[in-house]
Amino acid sequence: ALEVRGLTRAFGVRKALDAVTFDLPSRAFLSVFGPNGAGKTTLVKVLTTLLHPSSGTAKVLGLDVVDDAVEMRKRIGLISHNPLLYPDLTAEENLLFFADMYGIDQPHVRVAELLEAVELDHRKLDLTRTFSRGMLQRLSIARALLHRPEVLFLDEPYSGLDPHAMEILDGLIAQIRGDHTFVMISHDLDKGLELCSHALIMARGRIVLFEPREAIEVAAFRDTYRATVGMGVA
């Protein structure tokens, strides 16, 4: 599903990504770990076409993140820890707006289905500025799933969630993970390792470790992660 070769992204003289290379098979779940400034979010932004790489290449579903960006956006979804929603629209209006952008058939049916899945159907007519952070994140998840993406990118999706919202997100991931590829940034080692089929640790824009879950010895993995925390920004 992902083919990354020598991926580099520079901001001035600093390389937020420095020759990153890895492959991820279809229907895998990759958890990405690393300290602040390691390049995790920059990696996701490049892979979701929000940033252009300075050099190197990346393909998602065989599509180049630069040359095939328009087509690729139709087949991927992004769940951010900062929900991308309009505060002065209702929950239903938010989802219908994005459904129209994606050209979804029978948008009201799809929106109703997702509002029920994230347990917000009873709040569908309420303005989202009245929602708690957990509710906003749940609605953001519904938005990301509207067009049935094949690859889902999750940027710290559990950050700031209440226990109920965490349970809902766990359930949604369990329900769809067999048919999707996931890339999740996480600061929670336990949750990230619980979910993943592959794990990646970054520091200073580079890959420190990339292994399938079955090859990981948890204590050694924790030691490697702790060693990167003091490395800071490149």
Where are these regions (language model features)?
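A short, surface-exposed alpha-helical micro-motif characterized by mixed small hydrophobic
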Residues: 192-194
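Catalytic Walker B motif of ABC-type/P-loop ATPase nucleotide-binding domains
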Residues: 152-155
